[in-house]
Amino acid sequence: MNPNQKIITIGSVSLTIATVCFLMQIAILATTVTLHFKQNECNPPANNQVVPCEPIIIERNITEIVYLNNITIEKEVCPEVAEYRNWSKPQCQITGFAPFSKDNSVRLSAGGDIWVTREPYVSCDPGKCYQFALGQGTTLDNKHSNGTIHDRIPHRTLLMNELGVPFHLGTKQVCIAWSSSSCHDGKAWLHVCVTGDDRNATASFIYDGMLVDSIGSWSQNILRTQESECVCINGTCTVVMTDGSASGNADTRVLFIREGKIIHISPLSGSAQHIEECSCYPRYPDVRCVCRDNWKGSNRPVIDIKMADYSINSGYVCSGLVGDTPRSDDSSSNSNCRDPNNERGNPGVKGWAFDNGDDVWMGRTISKDSRSGYETFRVIGGWTTPNSKSQVNRQVIVDSNNWSGYSGIFSVEGKSCINRCFYVELIRGRPQETRVWWTSNSIVVFCGTSGTYGTGSWPDGANINFMPI
């Protein structure tokens, strides 16, 4: 082979090798791009709506990649699409309640800037629980705290913090309110906020941080709502509101709200005579509330709300061990499941109970005359049998030598069941403790447990002599 032929042969081989390498690089590039976009794909929702995919974590090689086995594929993780809550899981079977949270707000107020509050409650979104309360527009160590025993002033606002975080100066004021309710539908928070003149108040409906709807007083006598969480099922939320006399005939209505917009209003029906400050919980596919009769009964009213057709029915908790304060002695108290018992019906206190088959779990003050102490127990047959009085699983939450106050229920969805929890308002200051001019509270929170538990007492714990006057 002459020199020219050698040169041509070497050149041809080199060109062939270069062409093969070039084609391999194109194949590698095509494979990389294809794999990248396959990693990037999101499964569309059932209704075929377009869902944008936002990058969460992207891992990259910092050098040029030549060989496929050295390539790190960029992977973008698509966020889960929020869904409405339906609360379709069964209720957890429990043996009692275990301690969950305590905020110690009043004790901390002795040396820190903590809001003056009352009417607290707890509610949870799908991932976290929050505590709410109606602030008085002042901290405790502040001359404005003088006279905060009063319920309705234009400076009251709804406060919201993560559960266990006291209401410090950085706390968010969600809305203007001297009566409120809040709940999360799975996508966003709904807040029902009542404020204004006693004879012409306004309820604002705030959804996902925006004012969406409102309604004015319909009886011109202190429009008011639950002071605990509302309940949302499949995107429709329901809240109980009352306008009218606190010790006589009043007009109670059940409102149905979707993404902040009122879609239906149902009047109260059934045998309940007076409804205030309901504690509501999901009972799929419906909602059930246990309330306060401030007029005729120390047995608690029950409202059953049908979400499908907006129908309402009502009666009273059957247990003869009644839940309101003041009340008659347990040996003489009564309830027939249908009517108020006409036993020390006025005034009353916000409370809770929930059904467990034929039984009822309930909480109440230990004192039958005042808001002191707090206990929980289960009454055998207490949901279905008139005047049932067989009590089991009693627990002391706050001993009888310490003040309690309002209490209410909230629900938490677990992996396999829905747990019931409750909070107790621990009121301090006036009217019982006249050394100081203010009225405020802390809270203690318990949740249902299927395990064992011990004993104790969890009062507010502030020494009133250490507190600002």
From Swiss-Prot:
This is Neuraminidase. Residues 1-6 are intravirion. Keywords: Calcium, Disulfide bond, Glycoprotein, Glycosidase, Host cell membrane, Host membrane, Hydrolase, Membrane, Metal-binding, Signal-anchor, Transmembrane, Transmembrane helix, Virion. HAMAP family: INFV_NRAM. One of its GO terms (biological process) is viral budding from plasma membrane. GO terms for cellular component: host cell plasma membrane; membrane; virion membrane. Residues 36-88 are annotated as: Hypervariable stalk region. It is a single-pass type II membrane protein. The chain crosses the membrane at residues 7-29. Catalyzes the removal of terminal sialic acid residues from viral and cellular glycoconjugates. Cleaves off the terminal sialic acids on the glycosylated HA during virus budding to facilitate virus release. Additionally helps virus spread through the circulation by further removing sialic acids from the cell surface. These cleavages prevent self-aggregation and ensure the efficient spread of the progeny virus from cell to cell. Otherwise, infection would be limited to one round of replication. One of its GO terms (molecular function) is exo-alpha-sialidase activity. Residues 91-469 are annotated as: Head of neuraminidase. Residues 324-349 are annotated as: Disordered. Its EC number is 3.2.1.18. Its main location: virion. The influenza A genome consist of 8 RNA segments. Genetic variation of hemagglutinin and/or neuraminidase genes results in the emergence of new influenza strains. The mechanism of variation can be the result of point mutations or the result of genetic reassortment between segments of two different strains. Disulfide bonds join 92-417, 124-129, 183-230, 232-237, 278-291, 280-289, 318-337, 421-447. Glycans are attached at residues 61, 70, 86, 146, 200, 234, 402. Belongs to the glycosyl hydrolase 34 family. Intact N-terminus is essential for virion morphogenesis. Possesses two apical sorting signals, one in the ectodomain, which is likely to be a glycan, and the other in the transmembrane domain. The transmembrane domain also plays a role in lipid raft association. The keyword Transmembrane helix applies. Homotetramer. Ca(2+) binds at residues 293, 297, 324. The lineage of its organism: Viruses, Riboviria, Orthornavirae, Negarnaviricota, Polyploviricotina. It is found in: Virion membrane; Host apical cell membrane. N-glycosylated.
